[in-house]
């Protein structure tokens, strides 16, 4: 029985013995064998190299180390391998020790660190050729020691998995390679902006692996986040990125390469899973404007209901103005008041603090920040033509011009553009979640002023959008 099979048997044994609630508290999800094999296969193993220093932070039972050692020895049987496993969970360390003993029996030099990875990693002078990791998943408070430790080396991290990624990058030798399986969420959004910019300036992403089904990646542990594997090395930017996708843990459906600039930008990381995604990014980028160049802005509604209960009104009494909620919006349509809604429909304008929550009368494009599971689209937009001042709930974004309404033709054109199949597909490529933030909308390309006005009056906006994007007739968006 080889070391990988034995390591997998230990992982299965540990899964049965470990307490699920404690695993959740630790953010611990043991890597399935098939996923570990994918990860180790993605690592660059240079020809002619005979010394390898490997680090596995948060090693668990050691399945990643085992598959990495197995891969290197299969290519370089005489290689000298040094592995460092870092693990603090006393419940899995006995399994990890046995995996390290198996590695040692093959001539591998092993080291087990039972110290907190962040504390150890900040203080060590060691550097590695390979960092392979499945880091813990949980948020960090702003005053967490981990946050301060990482800030001292120039990284702003909002959670533990980004902290592990950041420190892993710091511990790489020049041309060293890091492979990490994490939630996809770090690739876009303001929450990760600082971390993302620093990470992609320190490392060059050259491989990304995605899974079509969220639930099959860590199905034993019921992880439902969108998970992604990213490989990156400490060196000059790669001209291309290799993209691969699995339908489940065991089957790599397709691998292809795309130009680096189509995946990694200054602001975010696109993850086009297939050729159709590549095409939709290329097509939507034919639209050359954005909100800023159109002279418009997008903001998030200012009314947070539970904080302003004293200003919420159940009836349209004197001094009330409309309060727009997500339930008031369907694609292209605003219904207010919505009498069958359980959400408050009116807002008190007579309070001395009310003015800062209210927008002037005018035309606005409202966009849901969150979409329900039953809604087919990520982006749901509608035009609201306000004859009087109004208030917008915090679960809505709204497009405006310096805090006031916008031209009604432009508003109609923008709503039709945002509700199009093409923009919906484009948004899915760069966003791994259903939340639509104001930052996301600022990044979306838009047609010109004249094209938006044309869309507003179009009898067939879908056809006109195809023409704007120069899409060949045979190409369709699913």
Q: Predicted segment positions?
A:
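Class I S-adenosyl-L-methionine
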Residues: 1-77, 84-103, 116, 121, ...
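Signature of N6-adenine DNA methyltransferases within the class I
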Residues: 24-25, 29-38, 58-66, 78-80, ...
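Polybasic, glycine- and aromatic-enriched phosphate-binding surface used to engage nucleic acids
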Residues: 282-477
